């Protein structure tokens, strides 16, 4: 359990957090129409008559959206409901042309599941925790109001209207902003592995409604508020902290928390009231008369299960077990599906090597490649160096052609030019030398130039050995084999 507490005037307060995540389904078409679901089109260019709620237009469920939701439910270890139904959620807003949203209140497609978050001592998560998922249902997204096009008017863009969403509702099991952040990162990772949502919060394809309440430890749950449409993990964590502190101040000041919907203002780092929170009866839910219940066949469910990829937890266990990777490396490499794919392509290019080479490959990817990509501001799928080239570079180190220092030089040239490492080594004369005669000659020069330090070393100052190694390597332009240098220095220095 989290040790996170808010220190108030009357003592410590525990924070109770639940998240409702809206994840846009990856599909070519919308949930009930054939209009494109792609992001970025000009306003109102991806709108069918169904999306615009023209009279007489009937919705037809998109099987691919249902398939993606079922696979996501399976990835969460959740119960798949073979029978589910669509309901109408009735409310008026300018970006909702139908006057209602087609959702699933009473009989969702997916039942209870779980998400496991890892221990992270730096973030205050002392041990791995399992967070309950209450349900997953599919629903339509609304359109978008545009307030920056005219000084006195707002415009409506219906491109997003009718796009399929999965609403993934957690149980109120989280107790700190860090746990909420870890939950969202893990959920986003799972969605990307499945391929059901790209998890791009900046484009709005994944957003979170944040439910927060506070209580004294052991007390019943307090009254919760819901902060709507938070579009980054960092903002979710900040909104939780801000809202929890606000609630403590209100209660300790003699006030009461009102169940309401709030908005988070990242510029001021505070939440503000948007409207009183509605209950289900306020929306007058009833079964959608235009849609039959969804009944999934055994064959359809089995096909969805067969299409599931290896998920991050299973892949991580395999990396640790079969490849012998350290737990940290395995966690980093499996946290993002693109990173895992790149690493596996690297291993394939290296001829599916044993544990020693796999470990070296993971270290190189995490330290050298990640460092370079961060410096360049690129994602791993935009890497200037391919997995094949990475495998060739590692092979040149393994066979002694390159030292670690030379390999770093070659890698920098690869980043700049895109050339293969073997060609760079050949053209620039960067091959490591193990010529004992040449190395002995340089060692003799280094010792002659540093006779005082030789005397100190032979007098017992063993730490000076590293100085002689460094001077020798420097004199040879980093091309000497470090192992041979060490061996010859030990023999020469005595």
From Swiss-Prot:
Keywords annotated in UniProt: ATP-binding, Ligase, Nucleotide-binding, Protein biosynthesis
SUPFAM superfamilies in the record: GatB/YqeY motif, Glutamine synthetase/guanido kinase
EC number(s) on file: 6.3.5.-
PROSITE patterns referenced in this protein's UniProt entry, alphabetically: GATB
EC category: ligase
Biological processes annotated in GO: glutaminyl-tRNAGln biosynthesis via transamidation; translation
GO molecular function: asparaginyl-tRNA synthase (glutamine-hydrolyzing) activity; ATP binding; glutaminyl-tRNA synthase (glutamine-hydrolyzing) activity
Disulphide connectivity of cysteines: none
Reactions this protein catalyses: L-glutamyl-tRNA(Gln) + L-glutamine + ATP + H2O = L-glutaminyl-tRNA(Gln) + L-glutamate + ADP + phosphate + H(+); L-aspartyl-tRNA(Asn) + L-glutamine + ATP + H2O = L-asparaginyl-tRNA(Asn) + L-glutamate + ADP + phosphate + 2 H(+)
Assembly information from the UniProt record: Heterotrimer of A, B and C subunits.
Function of the protein: Allows the formation of correctly charged Asn-tRNA(Asn) or Gln-tRNA(Gln) through the transamidation of misacylated Asp-tRNA(Asn) or Glu-tRNA(Gln) in organisms which lack either or both of asparaginyl-tRNA or glutaminyl-tRNA synthetases. The reaction takes place in the presence of glutamine and ATP through an activated phospho-Asp-tRNA(Asn) or phospho-Glu-tRNA(Gln).
Similarity comment: family membership: Belongs to the GatB/GatE family. GatB subfamily.
Name the record gives this protein: Aspartyl/glutamyl-tRNA(Asn/Gln) amidotransferase subunit B
Annotated organism of origin: Rhizorhabdus wittichii (strain DSM 6014 / CCUG 31198 / JCM 15750 / NBRC 105917 / EY 4224 / RW1) (Sphingomonas wittichii)
């Amino acid at each position: 359990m989290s040790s996170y507490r808010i220190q108030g005037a009357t003592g410590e307060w525990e924070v109770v957090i639940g998240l409702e995540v809206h994840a846009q389904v990856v599909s070519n078409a919308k949930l009930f129409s054939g209009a494109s679901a792609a992001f970025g089109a000009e306003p109102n260019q991806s709108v069918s008559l169904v999306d615009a709620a023209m009279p007489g237009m009937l919705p037809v469920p998109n099987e691919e959206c249902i398939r993606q939701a079922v696979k996501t439910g399976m990835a969460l270890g959740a119960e798949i409901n073979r029978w589910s139904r669509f309901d109408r959620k009735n409310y008026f807003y300018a970006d909702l042309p139908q006057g209602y949203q087609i959702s699933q209140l009473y009989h969702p497609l997916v039942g209870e599941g779980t998400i496991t978050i890892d221990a992270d001592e730096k973030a205050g998560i002392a041990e791995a925790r399992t967070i309950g998922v209450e349900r997953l249902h599919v629903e339509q997204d609304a359109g978008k109001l545009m307030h920056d096009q005219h000084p006195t008017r707002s415009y409506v863009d219906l491109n997003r209207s009718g796009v399929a969403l999965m609403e993934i509702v957690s149980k109120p099991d989280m107790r700190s902003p860090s746990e909420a952040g870890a939950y969202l990162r893990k959920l986003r990772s799972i969605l990307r592995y499945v391929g059901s949502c790209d998890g791009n919060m900046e484009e709005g394809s994944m957003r979170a409604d944040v439910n927060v309440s506070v209580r004294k430890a052991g007390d019943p749950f307090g009254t919760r508020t819901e902060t709507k449409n938070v579009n980054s993990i960092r903002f979710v964590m900040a909104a939780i902290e801000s809202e929890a502190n606000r609630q403590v101040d209100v209660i300790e000041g003699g006030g009461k928390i009102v169940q309401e919907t709030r908005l988070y203002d990242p510029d001021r780092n505070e939440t503000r009231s948007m409207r009183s929170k509605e209950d289900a009866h306020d929306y007058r839910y009833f079964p959608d008369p235009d849609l039959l219940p969804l009944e999934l066949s055994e064959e359809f469910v089995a096909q969805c299960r067969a299409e599931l990829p290896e998920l991050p937890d299973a892949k991580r266990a395999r990396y640790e077990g079969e490849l012998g990777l350290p737990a940290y490396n395995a966690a980093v490499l499996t946290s993002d599906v693109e990173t895992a794919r790149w690493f596996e392509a690297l291993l394939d290019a290296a001829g599916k090597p044993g544990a020693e080479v796999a470990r070296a490959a993971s270290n190189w990817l995490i330290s050298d490649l990640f460092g370079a990509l961060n410096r360049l501001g690129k994602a791993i799928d935009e890497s200037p160096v391919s997995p094949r080239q990475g495998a060739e570079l590692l092979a040149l180190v393994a066979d002694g052609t390159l030292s670690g220092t030379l390999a770093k030089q070659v890698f920098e040239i690869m980043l700049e030019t895109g050339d293969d490492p073997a060609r760079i080594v050949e053209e620039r004369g960067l091959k490591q030398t193990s010529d004992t005669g040449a190395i002995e000659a340089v060692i003799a020069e280094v010792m002659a130039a540093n006779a005082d330090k030789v005397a100190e070393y032979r007098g017992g100052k063993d730490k000076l050995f590293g100085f002689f190694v460094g001077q020798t390597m420097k004199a040879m332009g980093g091309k000497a084999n470090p192992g041979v240098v060490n061996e010859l220095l030990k023999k020469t220095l005595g």
